[in-house]
């Protein structure tokens, strides 16, 4: 676990009610957020500044490579960037920082382009920088906006085959 404190996750979303597509709603709970078809704008934790698990901080400091993703973008990947001690440890780390985008745009990020994944990171934690962004071929071909946005995060883009087989899950 990233924290020894029990945490609740919430998300600000739009598009939940088709009759009010621009109205914002707050959803709570990992399962609820993961299943929503609304557009997730922002996620948060309660408590908002939990202490990080000491073993997590030790692992970050001892790492040669830090890999964020793939996974459910808003409920598995982003929460790590909402714990201030974890963010500080990542920023202070000399490890190579690697961001792996999902192999498809399914689930919470349905309709998200690869650049949008990077924008979400920057919106939630503007100080975050990466050395490398890995993108699955087929999820993104040559994409000048993706390459440009990756450079703003300090990253070099690598587009390659990342899935071992045809999968429908964005995690594999």
Residue ranges of model-derived segments:
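An anion/phosphate-binding loop that grips the pyrophosphate of nucleotide cofactors and donors
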Residues: 63
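Short, flexible loop segments at boundaries between secondary-structure elements
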Residues: 94-107
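Metallocofactor- and cofactor-centric catalytic cores in central/energy metabolism, strongly enriched
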Residues: 17, 42, 46-50, 132, ...
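Electropositive, gly/pro-rich neighborhoods at or near active sites that engage anionic ligands
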Residues: 1-37
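Charged helix-capping and loop-helix junction motifs
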Residues: 80-87, 113-118
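Active-site glycine-rich loop that binds ribose-phosphate moieties when present
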Residues: 41-57, 82, 116
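Glycine/threonine-rich flexible loop motifs
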Residues: 73-82, 144
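C-terminal functional extensions of proteins
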Residues: 111-172
């Amino acid at each position: 676990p990233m924290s020894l404190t029990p945490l609740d996750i919430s998300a600000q979303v739009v598009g939940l009610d088709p009759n009010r597509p621009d109205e914002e709603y707050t959803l709570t709970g990992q399962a609820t957020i993961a299943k929503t078809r609304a557009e997730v704008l922002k996620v948060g934790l309660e408590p908002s500044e939990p202490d990080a698990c000491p073993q997590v901080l030790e692992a970050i400091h001892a790492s040669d490579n830090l890999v964020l993703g793939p996974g459910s973008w808003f409920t598995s990947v982003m929460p790590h960037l909402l714990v201030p001690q974890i963010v500080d440890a990542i920023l202070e780390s000399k490890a190579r920082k690697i961001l792996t985008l999902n192999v498809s745009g399914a689930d919470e990020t349905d309709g998200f382009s690869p650049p949008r994944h990077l924008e979400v990171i920057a919106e939630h934690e503007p100080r975050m920088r990466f050395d490398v962004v890995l993108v699955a071929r087929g999820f993104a071909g040559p994409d000048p906006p993706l390459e440009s946005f990756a450079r703003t995060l300090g990253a070099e883009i690598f587009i390659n085959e990342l899935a071992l087989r045809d999968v429908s899950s964005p995690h594999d």
